[in-house]
Amino acid sequence: MSGAGLELDGVWRRFPSGEDEVAVLKNVTLSIAPGEMVAIVGASGSGKSTLMNILGCLDQPSVGRYRVAGQDAGCLDGDQLAALRRGHFGFIFQRYHLLPHLSALDNVAMPAVYAGMALHQRRERARALLARLGLAGKEHHRPGQLSGGQQQRVSIARALMNGGRIILADEPTGALDSHSGEEVMRILKELNAAGHTVIIVTHDPAIAAQTERVIEIRDGEILRDSGAPAREAASQATEAQPDGGPLLRERLAEAFKMAMLAMSANRLRTALTMLGIVIGIASVVSVIAIGEGSRDYVLKGIREMGTQTITVFRGKDWGDDKADGVRTFLPGDVAALEGEGYVDSVTPETAQAQRIRYRNVDVNASVIGVGRDFFRVQGMKLAEGQSFSRDDIHFQRQVVVLDKNSRRKLFGDGEAVGRVILVGMVPATVIGVVAQRDRGFGGNSLQMWMPYSTAASRLFGQQHFDRFVIRVKDGQPTKLAEKAIGALLTQRHGGKDFFTYNMDEILKTVESSSRALSLLLALVAVISLVVGGIGVMNIMLVSVTERTREIGIRMAVGARQGDVLQQFLTEAVLVCLVGGAIGVALSYGVSFVFSLFVTEWKMSLSPPVIALAVACSSLIGVLFGFLPARNAAKLNPIDALARE
């Protein structure tokens, strides 16, 4: 076995006591050679446990030097000390210190996780060690299913997992019956014969008598040392595995597994912790989905009224009393606008209310004179029949296109296309019916459309129009087109007697306002998510307190501060992710119920919203889990192991 001698030179260990300090170890100088079997004996409070803690790199001297295989432990930081524990030491405790929620196999394999051993290798080695100690077939038993002697043998196997060049046994037989105690001592002697250095801390002279060397300590000082260091034993001990530190994948897998076990062990508490996250995520997702759905509903309605369109009205602005006196909107303007390169299509519009009759049905409807491109400009589709042709406009044909309301009122379920109705005093043939729009825009009023030439000459008795609607070609900026239209009409009319209404600008304004409102609502909902995150932090702080001994055990077998931090951070993130997933599922449930009561529009649960929920869950887990995880990582292993 390669040398791993232990040397203490003038070691003092002091602890604060009020305003003073108490010396527990006083000027201890000691050497233990590789391969020795040593007993450290003393009464309770003599300092023997403190000495063992320093020997095992769980604690450091206040004064003096401690070397392990020539390496000064006082010059090492926490992670380097953890590596030293992993590579050289194996601990056997009086109360076994096995993790109750892990199987015997997993308890034994735990040190190898932090040493970076691959999963299959550490499982094979753990099985071999358990079989070597007479525990074959007990691999999947938990500590509560094993006797005291069996638990101590599991503890011994764990001490050997990374090689265990130096075995530190603290009262290894103290909690066992005589038979089990004898069995444990037999195993320790065999390990010493195989080349392991075995150091036993005990108050029992009968146990001490079975070792090669006895060191008696009283009031922090070495009272008696039975002999000089023994010669180094033959090299038969299993060497520790090369320690490159735990692989990230192995560390994450172990952290995930332990997080699942911790959640399973406290199901009610985990469920209550998740509840805050579930409500928070469901609130945020639902509010955003409602906001997005309502925005889409409004914007779709606006688009159905015509996109890429600019409407030119008579007068200076809305409410202009002189608007009705403007007579400059003429067919020549339509021709001039159609000649512009940025214009896709143009339609004039003139509207009047007229009585409509068909057989015994007599209703009042809005009759609108339009151009042949009206339905294209407005983005309207025909459910039946056809639209107006160029000849319909040119020859002032008496034809009409109905909306769905007019069709239903006049014809019910009967045929509409081809029927002749009376518009005012003018007979007109129905050539088409406009499809019902999904939105509620337009209400329940009755509308129908005629060629503007027919309406002007046969119904309205006027040649001027009320307005123009211009559809701008795709890719052309509507803002620039609006300016060009204004300049053209100002020149033709000899002045500006009109104003324009840019539908795309309105669309952008509505979209911006909707997003701002959605963001405001989401920020309100985020408050519940923050409250849930605080709940996670509180529960994780409680969990750290409850699992302090587990943290100490993990540190004793070689876990670094980063490993402990990652362990508890993973648990917090996992709780939040599971809560987030349930929250998203709940949002889908809310969306389904919402659709039962609101049929006009739907909540918009888009992939970005779901991704946002997952990101929020992870972020909450990291932010609110970091403080408890950091507290766990900063625990002193001695204090942690001593916690009941």
From Swiss-Prot:
For this UniProt record, give its keywords in alphabetical order, as a comma-separated list: Antibiotic resistance, ATP-binding, Cell inner membrane, Cell membrane, Membrane, Nucleotide-binding, Translocase, Transmembrane, Transmembrane helix, Transport
Q: Which residues form the ABC transporter domain?
A: 6-244
Cellular component aspect of the GO annotation:
plasma membrane
Q: Where does it reside?
A: Cell inner membrane
One example GO MF annotation: transmembrane transporter activity
- Tell me the residue numbers annotated for binding ATP: G42, A43, S44, G45, S46, G47, K48, S49
InterPro entries, per this entry? Answer: AAA+_ATPase, ABC3_permease_C, ABC_transporter-like_ATP-bd, ABC_transporter-like_CS, MacB-like_ATP-bd, MacB_PCD, Macrolide_Exporter_MacB, P-loop_NTPase
TM ranges are 271-291, 415-435, 517-537, 574-594, 609-629
The family database entries (SUPFAM superfamilies) matched by this protein are listed as: P-loop containing nucleoside triphosphate hydrolases
Q: What does this protein do?
A: Non-canonical ABC transporter that contains transmembrane domains (TMD), which form a pore in the inner membrane, and an ATP-binding domain (NBD), which is responsible for energy generation. Confers resistance against macrolides.
Q: Assembly state and interactors?
A: Homodimer.
Q: Which family does it belong to?
A: Belongs to the ABC transporter superfamily. Macrolide exporter (TC 3.A.1.122) family.
Organism, scientific name = Chromobacterium violaceum (strain ATCC 12472 / DSM 30191 / JCM 1249 / CCUG 213 / NBRC 12614 / NCIMB 9131 / NCTC 9757 / MK)
EC number(s): the record gives 7.6.2.-
| Topology of this chain in the membrane | Multi-pass membrane protein
- Give the organism's phylogenetic lineage: Bacteria, Pseudomonadati, Pseudomonadota, Betaproteobacteria, Neisseriales
Q: What is this protein called?
A: Macrolide export ATP-binding/permease protein MacB
Q: What is its main location?
A: membrane
